[in-house]
Regions:
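Acidic beta-to-alpha connecting loop that harbors the catalytic carboxylate
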Residues: 162-166, 190-192
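Glycine-rich His-Gly loop
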Residues: 35-40, 119, 162-163
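Conserved alpha/beta-hydrolase "acid-adjacent" motif
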Residues: 166-172
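Loop/turn elements at helix/coil->beta-strand transitions in domains of secreted/extracellular proteins
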Residues: 29-32, 56-59, 110-112, 134-138, ...
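Primarily recognizes the serine-hydrolase "nucleophile elbow" in alpha/beta-hydrolase
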Residues: 99-153
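Short beta-strand/loop motif that positions the catalytic acidic residue
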Residues: 157-161
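C-terminal catalytic histidine-bearing segment of alpha/beta-hydrolase fold enzymes
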Residues: 183-210
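Serine-hydrolase catalytic machinery in alpha/beta-hydrolase-like enzymes
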Residues: 3-108
C-alpha cells in the first residue's frame, strides 16, 4: 500500500519485477506496465497479465482504484459523463504513482507507459492516454465499454472484446479509423465480460495471456 498524502488516500498496489531485472539499468531502462483492475475485482486478480509482462521484461504495477470510502460506480447513462469522476480519480492515482515510483525504480522507464485494464480499469487507461498522450506508448484493454479509445498515431492499442455485451457508441474504431490508427480490436468468441481475469475459464485466461 502506498499513500497519497495530498488526497489522504491509500492505494493498494502490487509490484512485480521482470524476470530479466538484472539487465535493467539507469542507462538502459526496462519498460513499465500498469495493470488496472476491473470494478469490484482485486488488483491481484490479473496475475496472468503480470506474468506475461514480467516474462517480456516489464516492471508491473497492479493497482486497485476503488476504496470502500469511494462513491459507488454510477449506473446512470450517459456513462461518458456520469463515470468521468471515477475515471479521473483513477487517472490522478496513476499520475501520482508514476511520479512516486519513478524515483524509487530508476532502472525503469516511466516516460513511455503501457497501460493495461479490464472493464472500468480499461476506461481509466483510455482516459489517461487521452489526457497524457506523450507519456503512453501502448494501451491494452479487456472489454472496456465506456471511454473512447484514443485516436492517436503514437499510441498502439489492443482491445480484446467479450462476446456478451456491446461497447457504447464511438468507443471502438470504425473501419476507416482502423486504417488510420495503430489500433487492433479482437473479439474473443464465447468470452464473457466478467470472466476476463484470473478467475475466468482456463481457455480464456490462456487466450488472454498471449
Amino acid at each position: 500500500v502506498i499513500t497519497d498524502e495530498s488526497r489522504n488516500r491509500t492505494i493498494p498496489i502490487n509490484i512485480t519485477l521482470p524476470s530479466n531485472n538484472a539487465k535493467c539499468t539507469e542507462q538502459v531502462k526496462c519498460p513499465v506496465a500498469f495493470i488496472n483492475a476491473g470494478y469490484g475485482i482485486s488488483h491481484n486478480g490479473y496475475t496472468f497479465a503480470s506474468n506475461a509482462f514480467n516474462q517480456r521484461g516489464y516492471l508491473t504495477i497492479a493497482v486497485t482504484h476503488e476504496l470502500k470510502s469511494d462513491p459507488y460506480l454510477n449506473r446512470e447513462q450517459p456513462y461518458l459523463t456520469t463515470r468521468m469522476e471515477n475515471w479521473h480519480r483513477g487517472v490522478v492515482t496513476l499520475k501520482f504513482l508514476v511520479n512516486e515510483l519513478s524515483s524509487k525504480y530508476p532502472a525503469y522507464d516511466f516516460t513511455k507507459l503501457t497501460l493495461f485494464g479490464h472493464s472500468n480499469g480499461g476506461d481509466i487507461s483510455a482516459l489517461y492516454g487521452s489526457i497524457y498522450p506523450n507519456e503512453v506508448s501502448t494501451i491494452i484493454t479487456l472489454d472496456h465499454r465506456r471511454m473512447l479509445i484514443p485516436r492517436n498515431k503514437n499510441i498502439h492499442v489492443l482491445t480484446l472484446r467479450g462476446s456478451d455485451y456491446p461497447a457504447d457508441a464511438d468507443v471502438l474504431l470504425n473501419d476507416s479509423e482502423l486504417n488510420k490508427f495503430p489500433v487492433t480490436q479482437i473479439m474473443i468468441e464465447k468470452s464473457r465480460h466478467n470472466d476476463m481475469y484470473d478467475g475466468g475459464p482456463k481457455w480464456l485466461v490462456d487466450r488472454m495471456s498471449k
